[in-house]
Amino acid sequence: MESSEKIVVIFCTIPASESEAMARALVERRLVACVNVIPVYSYYRWNGEFCSEPEHLLIAKTKRSMAEATIAAIKSLHSYEVPEIIAVPVIAGYAPYLAWVHAETKDEV
């Protein structure tokens, strides 16, 4: 795998009612190879108010070259005004898994 095709992990919190549709859309479009969905409880401030919400955390794996397209897709499908979308590079991993992520995501938008 070329260095330009490194893998990233994208984290996104989303209402539980939207998580399956979001995960399915990202995988079916081949923007990501895999999405894990984990129930979480989020505490934060929004518009000056303390908030707490049950949500789902999506953990998506994709190629670095697909990160911006994935973020754009998440933004377009997400119901929040300012969704949490964070991409972090994978600095090491099991080579066969990383190769699988590379193979299962499309090469360009």
Label every model-predicted segment.
Residues 1-109:
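Positively charged, small/polar-rich N-terminal and surface patches that mediate targeting and assembly
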